[in-house]
Structures are given as C-alpha cells and as structure tokens.
C-alpha cells in the first residue's frame, strides 16, 4: 500500500481550515474527560460515508464498505478532513470491538485552528479522583470504573495541503474487546438513524413511552443489535424532542398564567428556571383551590399518570375530596423534568401556596423519585402509593399468569383487599406466591417490600377521606375526562381545563342545593339517624345510613369487661369466625373497631353503631362527627387577610355576577344568532351596552366619593363646604381618590364578612354546646331509668 494513500472519508460536516504545522507555535488542549463527563451523543458519522473509487457510501452502508476494504490504520494514511479521520477510526473500532473518544488536540497560535488530534480507546487513562472535585459534589450513585490505562490510539496532523496525515497509531489494547453482538452497547457506536427518529416521533405522538417504542423498534429491525442504540438513548432523544417541541407553545402557558394573575392577584403561579435559562416546571393554583385546601386539605392526592398532551408532558394535579365526596383541585403542575429536585421544588412551592400547612396523608404514584421528594418535604405526612396504579402494573407484569390461571385475579384481590390483619395478609401473600409459583418474581418482591405504603391493612390507621385506592384514580381522571386527552396541545389545554373546572363547580353547587333542599328519607325511627341527616351532606348521610341500617343484621356481645373499657364481639348471626372487636370507653363515649373504618374514612362503622345500640347510646357523640363531612364544612373558618380577600373575590366573581351574566348572555346569544340581521343588531347593542356599563361604573364611583366629601366637609362648617364644592378637583386627583375609595370599600367588605363569619362561628358553637348538653342529659336520664 502506498505511503501517502489518500482516503476521502468525508462525513459532510465541513473541513477544518488549513495551516502550516509549526511546533514552536502550538497550544495543547486536553479532552480526557471522566466517564461521568462524556457526552451522551456518540461519535458517529451523520452524512456521507466512505468515498473511494467505488463511489459514495451512505451511513447505513458504511460498515459494509469498511468490511470490504478491511482497512487498518497505519502511519502515513491520509484523510481529507479531521472529521473523516475520526469517522474512519470509529468505524475501525466498531469492527474490532471497542469505543473511541477524543483525547487531546493542538491549536495554531497564529489563527487558533486545530492542527492535531488524538483519538483514543474509551478505556484510555484512569478515572480522575481529584479530592476537591469529589468533595464539592455529593455522589449519590457511584459509577463503575471503566478507565484501565489502555494505550490504543490514533493521532493525526494537518498538512500544508489541508489534508490530515496519521502521525501515530497504537494497535494493542490491555483489555478484552467486545464481541460483535455487543458492539451496539458501546457509547461511540450508538446512533439513532433518520428512519428510527421518524418512527420514534410517530409513536411518541401516539402516546407511547420509551420502553414500548424500543420493543416496536426491536421487532421492526429484527433484534436489538440491529437497532443501533439502547433504551436510554431513545429516552434521551424523546426528552430532548419533547423539550424542543414545547418551546414554541410554552409561552402560551406563561401568558395565560400572567393574565390570570393580572385579573386576580390572588391567583398563584410559579415557574422553576433551569440552568440553561429555559423554562422548567410550572405550578399554579386559583383562589378556589387555596380556599378548598383550607377546608379539605387533610388528605391530598398527587397524580402524575394523567398525560395531557401529545408531548406526554405530565399534567400533575393536586387533588382532594370535598364534603360531598367529590374530587376537588388544590393546584396543578406541568412537570417538564421528572427528577427528585424538580419534585422537591414543586412540593415546596405547593406548600407555600397552601400557607405552609402540610396534609395528614398524601397519595402518589408508585415512584421512587416521588417518594424521596415526599420524605424530604412532608416528613410527617403518611405517604401512600396508589393501589389502582399498582394493580394496573400487575396486569402488565403478570399477564402470562392472568392468562394461564383465571383464578389468580380473584385470589390476588382477596389477599390485598379482604385481609383483616397484617398477619392474615402475610400468610395469604406467601400462600398466593406458592400456589402460582411466583416466589422468585422480581416485581412482586419489589411491591412486597413496599407493602406498608399500598396494602390497605397497613394504612387503615390513617385518615384518607375514604378515597378508596381503587376508586381514587377513577375519580381523579373523571375530573378531566371528556375534556383533556393525549392529543390535547398546550394551546387547547387551558380552554378545556377551564370547561372541566366549570363543570365540576356546577356539580358542587348542585350537591349543595340537594343537601339543603332535598331532605333524605329516613329508614329507621332512630334519633341518631335524624341527627345525622341534619348534620351530614346528603351524599355522606347516605353512606352513614348504609352503615346504620347494616347494624340490624349484626349482634354485639361482651367479650371482656375491664371496668371503664369494655370489649364487644360484633358479628352477623352464625358468622362468629368473621367477628370484629370493638373496644368501648364508657366514660369518654369513644369506641375503636378492629376494622378501623372511622380512622381511615372518617365515617363510623356498623360495628361501633351496633355497640352503641346495645348500650342505648341514641345520638352520635361529637367525636364521630367530622366537620369536613358536614353541610357546614366551609363555615366557622377564621381567615387571614390573604384568604379572606381571595374568598371574597371568588364569591363575587364566580357565584354571583358571573353565573347571572352568563345565563342572561346565553339566552341573548341564542336569540340573536338566529339570523344575520339580528346578529348585526346584537353586536351594535353589545357595543352600546359596554359603553353604558363603563359610564355607569364611573358615575357610581364619583357619586359615592362626592357624597363622602360632602359629609366630611359639613363637619367643618358651611364656608369650607362651599369652597370644596366650588372648586372641582383635577382628573388625576379624582382618579387617585376613586382608587383609594375602592380600596377602602373592599376593606370594609372584608371586615363585614369577617364579622359575619365570626358571628356564625359563635352561634354554631353555642348550638353544638346546647346539643352536647342535651345528649348528656338524655343519657343520664336513660341510665337512671335503667338503674331504677
């Protein structure tokens, strides 16, 4: 072979500028990065491949071309460009079985152009264990050592002609090379081709995740080695693709939030910045969400499984449940970066918006990153994984078991949902694993290790507002069902989002109306049922009534009597083996049942009610009436200035003026739109109406202010009064006083509302005390009668 044989191995990304090689005028650059600092993007050709006597070879033909030529680097081998040399060495490395990277370079002091490069085996050198570097950053996941001091390399120099000449080649490696069926795992040989990118884009737009997309690619190409990249590469590409895709629409999101805040200063939103100055995660909460949290923020659900748009951008609502058992919002977020730091920022931001009052319990998806963030921000809250999410995963992970054993689903359900104690669950779980030979199943082992955060028997001692883990996800998803789906983009999102909120608000108003105007039908003569019907909302009373009627089939008998503490065994007739045990404190009138329904849901169970029946306790003790379930759940709350102002604004803008005007406007539009002529007339009428409303507002404010000045001046005497009336104030001064008057009126309204709220609170407390006294008197009379 000729000493100066030229290989035109141009990859189509340009040729470095020429320059004479002068060893006395050279700077040296080193690029020996640690593995942690290596770029994710591989060193691979992306344009035309090898160009020789046989013509052009495209990237998918490059390996074949290299195999045909069977070239090996040698001193004196010449290339058209630095990039061509890099591509050649990388192709050689792929054929041999190692990965490459750029190690060092030399630049000309004259013009700064690169005139020498060294490409090395990726295992060249050793890991940089600089003490200061490791001290400055916390290493959470130590990486394996991959540098072993390999000397294999290829050095090239630029000639006067502009071509690049091999000036040094070390062939031997000090480590084993990778076999051909594993070469695609090496970093420098992983590349997502154009057709693969197109397929990924299509599947991503259809809502598929990286794992399912990789499965489709492997099937399409006939094996993972032929795909040419890994699932991590696919995930990184999708993340970058998503980031680029939303850049154009993210401004719409910010504009919307700014406008909402401008319309109502109590609208809360926050945007997390990123290191590259791009927009990060976004959180917002309207005044109603903040007020609802004041009443119902004892338990919260954070759901990231609801993917709202074509970029699979996680729309993550914070939700709870109101006194009608309906899902309500406590704020929403778009999570662009699903990292622990992002979730920590989000939870802290949400907590600040909610006046820094953490919930008693919080439910999230089964995710290790979210769990770490929860532990950091809510260390005192009980964290639960969504059982619905885990059961859905179970169907995916154990699909072969479901198909082979139809009885598995029923057995799994009984084990998880119907066991009454920890011991029963443990025994049933391992019996299930043995029956279906699943002892070694990794996923089942993983969820078993997390059992205290999703299996009901471990969670019943904590309040979750009776949001069943199975029904929870259904109810939250139904909040936006019919409005938001996988094809919704950001430009459409908020219009549909607002429609969903409006629909949910109407349902809440309807439930309030039904509670106040549709008394429930009583099924027993029990004073307790009548009492509950007057206290609970309609929906919660129906739930209580179900438990009360259920006591008719249960018998309660004493199992142990320890003076003030009596234990009762409660069971259906003939089902003593299914008995529950209720411990009743006679002096405090408190009972605890082994089913822990009250602790979990806040609704008293039929077992305790059965004990109350046999002990002649005719009314519910106050301890068992949670205010959050009553029709007065939103009353008697002492507001701070911020929440009071937010609540006043919300009541005025939504429940009174907005609904009234919307109803009248709807009828107006329906009639006016029947013909072109009536439509034109309606437009003119609306324009005139807008002017009239504007004039009326100014006139009303000015009249109010004039009356105020008249009254104030009357105190100081008639002469001063005449001077004030005779000298009109400048427009700018008038506007300032108008604004001042508006602020004073708003403050007066807030104070009046606060006084009214406090008065209602006092009256309600008096009624509660009166009821408690009546109950105690009645119980004393009953006890005296029994003793006689």
From Swiss-Prot:
Record-annotated MULE domain positions: 299-395
Entries under Pfam families matching the protein: FAR1 (PF03101), MULE (PF10551), SWIM (PF04434)
GO MF: zinc ion binding
Region span, Disordered: 713-733
Ranges where the FAR1 domain occurs: 87-179
Keywords: Coiled coil, Metal-binding, Nucleus, Zinc, Zinc-finger
Biological process annotations from GO: regulation of DNA-templated transcription
InterPro entries xrefs: FAR1_DNA_bnd_dom, FHY3/FAR1, MULE_transposase_dom, Znf_PMZ, Znf_SWIM
Keyword Zinc-finger attached: yes
Domain of life assignment: Eukaryota
Any coiled-coil regions, as ranges: 731-768
Inducers of expression: Up-regulated in hypocotyls by far-red light treatment.
Keyword Transcription: no
SMART domains given in the database record: ZnF_PMZ
GO CC list: nucleus
Role according to the record: Putative transcription activator involved in regulating light control of development.
Name under which the protein is recorded: Protein FAR1-RELATED SEQUENCE 5
Organism field: Arabidopsis thaliana
Lineage: Eukaryota, Viridiplantae, Streptophyta, Embryophyta, Tracheophyta
Encoding gene per record: FRS5
């Amino acid at each position: 072979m000729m000493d100066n044989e030229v290989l035109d191995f141009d990859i189509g990304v340009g040729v470095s500028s020429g320059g004479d090689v002068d060893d006395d005028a050279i700077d040296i650059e080193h690029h020996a990065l640690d593995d942690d600092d290596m770029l994710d993007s591989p060193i691979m050709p992306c344009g035309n491949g090898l160009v020789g006597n046989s013509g052009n070879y495209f990237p998918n033909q490059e390996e074949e071309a290299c195999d045909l030529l069977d070239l090996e680097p040698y001193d004196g081998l010449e290339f058209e460009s630095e990039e061509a040399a890099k591509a050649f060495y990388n192709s050689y490395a792929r054929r041999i079985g190692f990965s490459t990277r750029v190690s060092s370079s030399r630049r000309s002091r004259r013009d700064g152009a690169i005139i020498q490069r060294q490409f090395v085996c990726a295992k060249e050198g050793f890991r940089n264990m600089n003490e200061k570097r490791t001290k400055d950053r916390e290493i959470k996941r130590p990486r394996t050592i991959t540098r072993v001091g390999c000397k294999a390399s290829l050095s090239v120099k630029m000639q006067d002609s502009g071509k690049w000449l091999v000036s040094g080649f070390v062939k031997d490696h000090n480590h084993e090379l990778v076999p051909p069926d594993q070469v695609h795992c090496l970093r420098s040989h992983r590349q997502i081709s154009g057709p693969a990118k197109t397929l990924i884009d299509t599947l991503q737009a259809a809502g598929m995740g990286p794992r399912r997309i990789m499965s489709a690619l492997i099937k399409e190409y006939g094996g993972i080695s032929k795909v040419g990249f890994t699932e991590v590469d696919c995930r990184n590409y999708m993340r970058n693709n998503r980031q680029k895709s939303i850049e154009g629409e993210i401004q719409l999101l910010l504009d919307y939030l700014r406008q909402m805040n401008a319309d109502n200063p109590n609208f809360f939103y926050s945007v997390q910045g990123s290191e590259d100055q791009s927009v990060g995660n976004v959180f917002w909460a309207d005044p109603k969400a903040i007020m609802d949290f004041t009443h119902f923020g004892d338990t919260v659900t954070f759901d990231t499984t609801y993917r709202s748009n074509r970029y699979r951008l996680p729309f993550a609502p914070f939700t709870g449940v109101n006194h009608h058992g309906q899902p309500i919002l406590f704020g929403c977020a778009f999570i662009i970066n699903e990292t622990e730091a992002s979730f920590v920022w989000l939870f802290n931001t949400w907590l600040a918006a909610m006046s820094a009052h953490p919930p008693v319990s919080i439910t999230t998806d089964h995710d290790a990153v979210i769990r770490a963030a929860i532990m950091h921000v809510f260390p005192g809250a009980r964290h639960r994984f969504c059982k619905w999410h885990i059961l859905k995963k179970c169907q995916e992970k154990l699909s072969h078991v479901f198909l082979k054993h139809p009885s598995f689903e029923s057995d799994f359900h009984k084990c998880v949902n119907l066991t009454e104690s920890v011991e029963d669950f443990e025994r049933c779980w391992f019996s299930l694993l043995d029956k279906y030979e699943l002892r070694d199943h990794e996923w089942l082992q993983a969820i078993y290790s997390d059992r205290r955060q999703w299996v009901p028997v471990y969670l019943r001692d904590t309040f979750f507002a009776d949001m069943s883990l199975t029904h929870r996800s259904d109810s939250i998803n139904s909040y936006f069902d019919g409005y938001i789906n996988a094809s919704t983009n950001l430009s459409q999102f908020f219009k549909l989002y607002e429609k969903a909120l409006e629909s949910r608000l109407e349902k809440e108003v309807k439930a309030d109306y039904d509670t106040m105007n549709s008394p429930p039908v009583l099924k027993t003569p029990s004073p307790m049922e009548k009492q509950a019907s007057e206290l609970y909302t309609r929906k919660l009373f129906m739930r209580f009534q179900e438990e009360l009627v259920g006591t008719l089939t249960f018998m309660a008998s004493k199992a142990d009597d320890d003076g003030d503490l009596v234990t009762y065994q409660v069971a259906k007739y003939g089902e003593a083996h299914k008995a529950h045990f209720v411990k009743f404190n006679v002096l405090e009138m408190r009972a605890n049942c082994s089913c822990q329904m009250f602790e979990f849901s806040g609704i008293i169970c039929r077992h305790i009610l059965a004990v109350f029946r046999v002990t002649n306790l005719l009314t519910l003790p106050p301890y068992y009436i949670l205010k959050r379930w009553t029709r007065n759940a939103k009353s008697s709350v002492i507001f701070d200035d911020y929440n009071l102002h937010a609540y006043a604004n919300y009541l005025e803008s939504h429940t009174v003026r907005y609904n009234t005007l919307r109803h009248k406007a709807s009828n107006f539009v329906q009639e006016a739109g029947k013909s072109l002529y009536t439509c034109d007339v309606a437009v003119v009428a609306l324009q005139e109406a807008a002017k009239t409303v504007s004039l009326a507002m100014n006139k009303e404010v000015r009249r109010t202010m004039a009356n105020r000045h008249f009254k104030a001046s009357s105190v100081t005497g008639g002469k001063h009064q005449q001077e004030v009336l005779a000298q009109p104030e400048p427009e700018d001064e008038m506007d300032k006083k108008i604004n001042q008057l508006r602020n004073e009126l708003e403050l007066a309204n807030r104070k009046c509302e606060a006084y009214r709220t406090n008065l209602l609170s006092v009256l309600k407390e008096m009624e509660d005390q009166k009821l408690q006294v009546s109950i105690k008197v009645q119980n004393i009379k009953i006890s005296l009668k029994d003793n006689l």
